[in-house]
Amino acid sequence: MSSAAQSDGNLLAAKSRRLGEHLRSLGRLLVAYSGGVDSAFLAWAAYRELGDDMLAVLADSPSLARSQMQDAVAFAQERGIPLAIIQTAEMERSEYRKNDGFRCFYCKDELFTVMEQFRAEHGFSVIAYGVNTDDQGDHRPGQGAARQHGVAAPLLAAGLSKQEIRELARAADLRIWDKPASACLSSRIEYGREVTPEA
């Protein structure tokens, strides 16, 4: 192994340890879970560190493809990750249906509002989601909603990039390590065109 490769490996191992330490510091944890690489790896890592003091929360929404939802449920079951399915109603919000450049804000605001109610009712301490270092700097209104709701970002706190998350997932033999990125169904509708369940 070259010294550069060894250095990269040491850095990634350090980030993985940092992630574990951060997760343990959060207490009873809800993870916003969609089945994508980031949220699936975060849910797995949280379960590894916290056991039954974590719960992955999957939103059953018209904007989530049925095949993606089924795969998300299957992955959680395969890994023994505790899972709850909640209902969100972003389609009932006129500002979401309007489909301007802030649609993702209203979607995440709906998600985190419902998760916050769930958190309070079931005695969890913190909500976390799977944003990473590559998500910084783009137009990401959903991150604004996360900040407003005080949602933790453990992968970001550990300094993990998308590629590093894939590498750690592969090392852990998680089948999602090479899963392609997949946007929600609503993102396939051009801005300015109303979003409806039928669109």
Feature map (PLM): residue ranges:
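ATP-dependent adenylation/nucleotidyltransferase module used to activate substrates
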Residues: 2-171
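Mid-to-C-terminal catalytic subdomains of enzymes
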Residues: 156-199
